Amino acid sequence: MPQAIVALVGKPNVGKSTLFNRLSLREKSIVHDLPGITRDRKYAKANLFSDLIVVDTPGLEFAAAGSLEFNMMQQSLVAINEAHIICFVVDAITGILPIDEECANLIRKHNKQSSTILVINKTEKPIILDKSYYKLGFSESVCISAKHGQGIYELGDIIQNILSEDKKINFLTTTNTKCEYNQQRPELELAIVGRPNCGKSTFINAILNEDRVLTGPQSGLTRNSVEIDWEYYGHLIRLVDTAGVRKKNAVTQSCELLSVNDTFKTIRFANIVVVMIDATRGLEQQDLSIISYAVNEGRGIVLVVNKWDLIKKKKEFQKELSRLIAYSVFQIKGINPIYISAKEKFNLESVLQQCVLTYASWQKRVTTGTLNQWLAKAMSNSPLPFQSHGKRVKIKYCTQTKARPPTIKLFCNNIESIDESYKRYLINNFKLNFDIAAGVPVRLSFVKGKNPYR
C-alpha cells in the first residue's frame, strides 16, 4: 500500500528528533541539548499511525554555500521537496524568532503542493498563542510536548484528516524509493563501521550514486546511524551509515559517547558488518577492537581498505596487513581485504558481491548426517590427544543448533582435554569443507555426554 511521507522540519533544537522518536516508537535519533546533532535525513515507519513514513531532518540554518550548516540544510530541503505533509516544528519556550519566519518562507518556496502543520512543541504547560504564531501563515496548528507525549494523537488526527481530504496528494507519483521503508523486512542489514573519517559516508554515496549522507574533510560528520533501504540485484538491503568510533579515552563529549553507543547498537542488530580501514593510517588497534566486537556479537565481517588510490607501495602494504590480521583475529583467519577508493568509485562492486556471499555463508545450515561425516574425517586426519590415564578424548556426535552465525554443538567425553588449538583446527576445517566465508565466525559448543540419539 502506498505510504505518505511526513517531514519534521524546523530550526535546530526545537525537538524534531524527540518527536521523530515518539512517532516511530523507537529511539532511532540521538537527542541532546547541543544543537546540530542531527545532520542527515532519517526515515522510519510511524508506528502510531498506519501507512506513514516520518522523516527527521537537520535543523534549518542559513549559512554560506559549502559550509557544514549549508550542506545540512540541503538535506532538509530534499525532505521538504519529497514530503506529502510537513510538520513545521517551533519552540514554545523561545517563541517565534526571525529564523522561524525564514524557515516558514523556505517551506512555502520549496514545497507549494504539500500541506504544512505548525507544530508548537515544549508546551508542557498551557500557553496562549500570540499573533506571531498566526503570522507564519499556516492554517493547521497543534500544541504538543514530544518529550511527554502530550498532543501526539491530536497531531495524528490532523495528519489523517489531511490525507483523507486533500485530493492533491497522489502517492503514486512518489519517485524517491530509497526513502520509503519497504513493507517487506530487508533481506540483509549491512552496517558500515570504522574510525572517524575513513570514508564510510563517501562509500555509501558512491554506491547509491547520490549525495545521500553528509561528507567532508571534517572528522565526525556522521553522528546518528542513518538507515537507507536499497535494492541490489534483487536483494533488499538496508545500508546503515554509522558514526566513527574513536578510542574510549579520546571520547570526551557526551554527544560523541551517544554516537559511539549508537554505532555499537547498530553492529549488534546488523547481519553483515563492513569494517572500513583508512589505508593512509593502516590497521590500528581501534580497527581490531571494532572487528573483535563484531565477531563476538556473531556478525559476518567484510574487511574493506579505503583510500587505496593514495597508497604507493601497495604490495608491501598488503603483505603487512595480512600478517597483522592473521596474528590478531584468528576467528576471521584467511579473510581477504577488499581494496577500494570510495572517492574514485574504484572496486565498489567487489564489496557488495562479498557482502552477499558472506551473508549466504552466515546463515548456512548443514544437515546432521553430513556434519557427522565431516567430523569423523576431521578427527581421522588430526586425532584428538590422549587423556592422562591413557584413554583417547572422543567427540561422539555433533549437530548444528543454529545459523546466523553457524553454531555447532559437540558431545564429547572430556571437554577439558580439548585445547584452543584443536578448536581452531575444527573451525578452520569446517569453513574449508563447507565453503564458509572467512569473515563468518563459527561457534563451537562442547557438551559432556553421550550421543543423545543413541
Swiss-Prot record:
Binding residues for GTP 1: 10-17, 56-60, 121-124
Cited InterPro entries: G_ENGA (IPR031166), GTP-bd (IPR006073), GTPase_Der (IPR016484), KH_dom-like (IPR032859), KH_dom-like_a/b (IPR015946), P-loop_NTPase (IPR027417), Small_GTP-bd (IPR005225)
Positions that bind GTP 2: 194-201, 241-245, 306-309
One example of a Gene Ontology biological process annotation: ribosome biogenesis
Occurrences of domain KH-like (ranges): 364-450
Keyword Repeat: yes
Listed CDD domains: EngA1 (cd01894), EngA2 (cd01895)
Domain EngA-type G: 4-167, 188-363
Keyword entries, A-Z: GTP-binding, Nucleotide-binding, Repeat, Ribosome biogenesis
Entry's Gene Ontology molecular function annotations: GTP binding
The organism's place on the tree of life at top rank: Bacteria
HAMAP family: GTPase_Der (MF_00195)
Similarity comment text for this entry: Belongs to the TRAFAC class TrmE-Era-EngA-EngB-Septin-like GTPase superfamily. EngA (Der) GTPase family.
Subunit structure: Associates with the 50S ribosomal subunit.
PANTHER family in UniProt: GTPASE DER (PTHR43834:SF6)
Official protein name in the record: GTPase Der
Organism: Orientia tsutsugamushi (strain Ikeda) (Rickettsia tsutsugamushi)
